[in-house]
């Protein structure tokens, strides 16, 4: 008996690495030391010497049960973008620049072409956020996971000068909330999605006029990465006072996390367009509006608070980075929390 008889194919692992190398190479930054295959990824910090007090930021996340849709649709080239987005958006939300990323794939069976396709999405997410893919792990788990399934997670490290960390300090009554459009559901709440819709190829491949695409394509749309937009705002000389990445828990959980005691956020629901996919989900699943806003981003993936005098500069900077911003509310004095009006 050998290792392959037990369900672990070492040769498939080697082939996966060879196939993914070209994708990884496309993400390299000058600070990366060495190549793929070492025991650890090395990244020089010499480029941050101009910072007064550099602080490293880290984030880890996955794609949740969104991967189930990738299995059903046999589409694996974008789920890696989601893994990167969930991590680097958190780093950027604190004011940081993502530096490097590592991925972790657990699978029932290592199909090299599929693994390389997944990593191509990870690499694309890294390119969109300007960080290097310095390493990763593909773990074959025979007997623990079905052969055609996998889970994907990632880890991002970034840097920010301590004085530039976004903490919510300095928020005042009248500060303006600006939200950036999402691509759709992003990467959370898919356990509910899978209860609302029948999860089979026929259902997911059905075209819907109101969506302008198939249900599966709308649901699998990769999470938007806001790193470049937030950097553009910073480069425009705007101080972002507070920032919230709208993920699991929706508006009600994530917006209060950007606030300080004594400040409350007011969001106007009609100030921006809610994507059709959320309207369809609410209708087909008979999901109450409050539950939708307590679970999903409802069309806004990132919300920042800025001084009223900086609104125009902020909007222009976000647009220049390719994002779609909306003025969606304001900060008021009051108990820490959020009101949707």
Swiss-Prot record:
Pfam families: AIRS (PF00586), AIRS_C (PF02769). It comes from the Bacteria. Keywords: ATP-binding, Cytoplasm, Ligase, Nucleotide-binding, Purine biosynthesis. GO terms for biological process: 'de novo' IMP biosynthetic process; adenine biosynthetic process. It is found in: Cytoplasm. Its EC number is 6.3.3.1. Pathway: Purine metabolism; IMP biosynthesis via de novo pathway; 5-amino-1-(5-phospho-D-ribosyl)imidazole from N(2)-formyl-N(1)-(5-phospho-D-ribosyl)glycinamide: step 2/2. GO terms for cellular component: cytosol. It catalyses: 2-formamido-N(1)-(5-O-phospho-beta-D-ribosyl)acetamidine + ATP = 5-amino-1-(5-phospho-beta-D-ribosyl)imidazole + ADP + phosphate + H(+). One of its GO terms (molecular function) is ATP binding. Belongs to the AIR synthase family. This is Phosphoribosylformylglycinamidine cyclo-ligase. It comes from Agathobacter rectalis (strain ATCC 33656 / DSM 3377 / JCM 17463 / KCTC 5835 / VPI 0990).
